[in-house]
Each structure stands twice: as structure tokens, then as C-alpha cells.
């Protein structure tokens, strides 16, 4: 299974980019041995439309244009379900074992995700009740993907 992160907004050079790259690299090392075909990250430019609804629609169209046709969509959304790392790993492991080709994780921009993307998501995940900037959500998601791989591999990184 290939994992794909599609994020509205760009990570500039700096600590967030360094952390994102670090977790992505760590996942590449362990994920391959677990049957994962990679972890791709695509960035979508933030819409410049004046109207928030129009921005959300434009960003949703850009996200869907990058998403594979056959996939499981996972929304990173403040209204999503809070799940622990072990449950997150269970989802990834189950989808891999079911021969799902692609699992796509969507991170919205400042206005969030469109209602259409929320409806299409198989799973909606929140990293707690707080609202996070998309840069931090991306780093936290990549860390959780890496952590999930270590859980599936029985690696000592996760000591939960």
C-alpha cells in the first residue's frame, strides 16, 4: 500500500520541514519491510479567493486532482475522531492487509476541508480538541505514520 499526504499550503525551509523530512525518511526505512510502497507528500497552493467558501471549493478540487482514483481517504479534521497511536496503526495494518492500493491523508488549509471531502473520507482524525496550523499537523501526521509502522513492526520506538 502506498501512503499519500496531500496538504494545502507549503512547508518552507525550517524546523517543520526538517522534522517532516526526518519522519518521512524514517518511515521509508521501516515501511518497505512492512509492505508499504512509499510515502508521497504533495502540496497544494492555498487559494487566493476572497470568499472562504470559494477557497474551500478550489482547494478541494486541487486535492482531488492529485488523489488516486481508487483510494481510502483520511481527513485530518478538528471535528474528527481522536484515536490513539495503536488504533491508527491498526487502521494502516488492516488496509495494507486488505490490499488497499492507496491511503490518502488530506490536510486542509486555514478554512478547513470542504464538506464533500469530509463526506468522502473513510476516517476523519483529529489530533486532540485544539486547532493546529497545517504545518504542525503535517509533522504530527508524518510522526504518527512512522510510529504506526514501528508498532506494526514491533519496534521499541513506541512504548505505549
Curated annotation (Swiss-Prot):
One of its GO terms (cellular component) is cytoplasm. InterPro entries: Alpha/beta_knot_MTases, RlmH-like, tRNA_m1G_MTases_N. It comes from the Bacteria. The keyword rRNA processing applies. S-adenosyl-L-methionine binds at residues 76, 108. Its EC number is 2.1.1.177. SUPFAM superfamilies: alpha/beta knot. Keywords: Cytoplasm, Methyltransferase, rRNA processing, S-adenosyl-L-methionine, Transferase. Pfam families: SPOUT_MTase. It catalyses: pseudouridine(1915) in 23S rRNA + S-adenosyl-L-methionine = N(3)-methylpseudouridine(1915) in 23S rRNA + S-adenosyl-L-homocysteine + H(+). Gene3D superfamilies: 3.40.1280.10. It is found in: Cytoplasm. One of its GO terms (molecular function) is rRNA (pseudouridine-N3-)-methyltransferase activity. Belongs to the RNA methyltransferase RlmH family. Specifically methylates the pseudouridine at position 1915 (m3Psi1915) in 23S rRNA. NCBIfam families: PRK00103.2-3, PRK00103.2-5. Homodimer. This is Ribosomal RNA large subunit methyltransferase H. The gene is rlmH.
Amino acid at each position: 500500500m502506498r501512503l499519500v499526504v496531500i496538504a494545502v499550503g507549503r512547508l518552507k525551509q525550517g524546523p517543520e520541514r526538517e522534522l517532516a523530512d526526518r519522519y518521512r525518511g524514517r518511515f521509508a526505512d521501516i515501511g518497505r519491510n512492512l509492505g508499504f510502497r512509499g510515502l508521497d507528500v504533495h502540496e497544494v497552493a492555498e487559494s487566493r479567493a476572497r470568499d472562504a467558501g470559494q477557497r474551500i471549493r478550489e482547494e478541494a478540487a486541487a486535492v482531488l486532482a492529485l488523489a488516486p482514483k481508487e483510494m481510502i481517504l483520511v481527513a485530518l479534521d478538528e471535528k474528527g475522531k481522536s484515536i490513539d497511536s495503536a488504533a491508527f496503526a491498526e487502521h494502516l495494518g488492516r488496509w495494507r492487509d486488505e490490499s488497499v492500493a492507496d491511503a490518502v491523508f488530506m490536510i486542509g488549509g486555514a478554512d478547513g476541508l470542504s464538506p464533500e471531502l469530509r463526506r468522502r473520507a473513510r476516517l476523519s482524525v483529529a489530533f486532540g480538541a485544539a486547532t493546529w496550523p497545517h504545518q504542525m499537523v503535517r509533522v504530527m501526521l508524518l510522526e504518527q505514520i512512522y510510529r504506526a509502522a514501528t508498532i506494526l513492526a514491533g519496534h521499541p520506538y513506541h512504548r505505549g
